A protein has these predicted regions:
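Active-site mouth loops of central-metabolism enzymes
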Residues: 41-53, 99-109, 161-170
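Active-site cofactor/substrate anionic-group-binding motifs, chiefly glycine-
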Residues: 30-77
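N-terminal active-site wall of soluble small-molecule enzyme domains
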Residues: 58, 81-90, 107, 148
């Protein structure tokens, strides 16, 4: 449903007897092998075009100024075109907390190349099954995904994050990822950017799949 976000239905429980003082409130969190000042970050969205590069540079500027982690969209376009500069934000923002991502269909050597070229704090490996199915040029072979994931988890020189792209990650997938060596997952559920909607607007004809997947709240509850 356009405009719907599952977090709108979440109500916080009021507690009348606090156990800490206000100045003891601590927002720091730990994931992907390190501590972070905030429990949120600017997640992967775009890249691979002039407009995408403009958006990435603006987001990187904000992220650096605020001390927030910024993740670029899939680096796959730059792997095909070495002249692609839409992901090169560290040169302009040397203090930026930076990470990037590529698709799980990419073999380990391309993941290593991505790390060498971008020097991220971690690498997201994204799973986008429904998006691929809706893309006329999308992947149709998925048997190698789990093998790729196991290789990344074992050999990657930086922390690995297995990332959904807005369809939610179910408990079975999370459990299988753990068995393959993954220690950090991004369950990104329905309610934000919809790549099903984007692909259907781009020329697809399966609008009945625009709302496919679990919401982020459903995915969070399922992951407990």
């Amino acid at each position: 449903t356009p405009g719907y976000n599952s977090f709108d239905e979440v109500e916080l429980i009021h507690s009348s007897l606090p156990t800490i003082d206000l100045d003891e409130v601590d927002l720091t969190t730990h994931f992907a092998g390190r501590d972070w000042d905030y429990p949120f970050y600017i997640n992967a969205m775009t890249g691979g075009s002039a407009k995408g590069g403009e958006i990435n540079r603006k987001l990187a500027q904000v992220a650096e100024a605020c001390g927030i982690l910024f993740v670029t969209g899939s680096y796959s376009a730059a792997l095909k075109d070495p002249q692609d500069s839409s992901y090169r934000v560290k040169d302009l923002h040397p203090d930026l907390l930076f990470a990037t991502n590529i698709g799980i269909d990419k073999p380990l050597e391309l993941g290593i190349q991505t790390i060498e070229e971008t020097q991220p704090l971690f690498l997201q490996l994204h799973v986008n099954l429904m998006q691929e199915l809706l893309m006329p040029e999308g992947e149709r072979s998925f048997r190698n995904w789990q093998g790729h994931l196991a290789g990344y988890a074992k050999q990657l020189p930086v922390p690995l994050v297995l990332k959904e792209v807005g369809f939610g990650m179910d408990a079975g997938t999370i459990q299988r990822a753990i068995e393959l060596g993954v220690r950090t997952v991004d369950i990104s559920g329905r309610g934000g950017t919809s790549f099903a909607y984007i692909e259907n607007r781009r020329g697809g004809n399966r609008s009945y799949l625009n709302d496919w997947g679990q919401t982020t709240v459903q995915a969070l509850l399922g992951a407990q």
